[in-house]
């Protein structure tokens, strides 16, 4: 079967881009994994992750799994990789989390949940944010899927009329 994802990793302090295949992180320092959903929700998740990382002495990993429809080749996602990289870099830079050595991992994939399950280490600490609704949102479905695979998931709910910190 053909490879269904590709990886790009960015260190905000040193904007180098590394491409490769997704793989889980090795042993070492505790990681708080922030899942990119949308810019406003990711800012809220980064704030919560900063508090967790401070209390746990952990580093922060921002993971963005961007699904590409089967009608498009994997090498040509609907949103340019350069745009996604700059968006993620700006989000992390504005979050004032440099003391936690945040790094950004961009995965271009077919299935977002499958990719996240594959790249997260066992029993990972995950922070994800999304709008509060009475129906299950995409963010809630991701959180539920990651919990079912044994990860510890913190869901940061956003109010519907929440103001954005993005400017």
Regions found by a protein language model. Give the residues of each.
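Residue-level marker for well-ordered alpha-helical positions
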Residues: 47, 89, 137-141
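Acidic, proline/glycine-rich short linear motifs
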Residues: 3-4, 8, 12, 62-87, ...
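Active-site-adjacent beta-strand anchor residues
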Residues: 35, 106, 136
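Glycine-rich, N-terminal phosphate-binding loop of Rossmann-like dinucleotide-binding domains
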Residues: 36, 130-131
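Short, well-ordered secondary-structure micro-motifs
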Residues: 45, 72-75, 115-117, 138-139, ...
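Small/aliphatic-rich secondary-structure junction motif
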Residues: 23-75, 145-151, 155-160
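A glycine-rich helix N-cap at a beta->alpha junction
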Residues: 80-105
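Structural beta-alpha unit
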Residues: 1-25, 97-126, 132-133, 141-153, ...
């Amino acid at each position: 079967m053909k490879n269904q994802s590709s990886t790009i990793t960015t260190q905000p302090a040193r904007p180098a881009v590394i491409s490769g295949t997704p793989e889980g992180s090795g042993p070492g320092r505790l990681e708080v994994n922030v899942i990119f959903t949308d810019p406003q929700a990711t800012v809220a998740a980064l704030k919560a992750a900063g508090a967790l990382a401070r209390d746990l002495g952990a580093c922060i990993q921002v993971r963005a799994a961007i699904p590409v429809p089967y009608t498009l080749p994997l090498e040509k996602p609907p949103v340019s990789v350069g745009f996604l990289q700059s968006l993620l870099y700006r989000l992390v830079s504005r979050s004032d989390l440099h003391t936690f050595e945040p790094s950004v991992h961009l995965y271009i994939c077919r299935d977002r949940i499958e990719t996240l399950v594959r790249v997260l280490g066992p029993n990972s600490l995950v922070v994800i944010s999304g709008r509060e609704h009475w129906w299950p949102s995409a963010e809630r479905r991701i959180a539920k899927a990651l919990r079912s695979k044994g990860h510890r998931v913190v869901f940061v709910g956003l109010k519907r009329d929440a103001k954005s910190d993005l400017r």
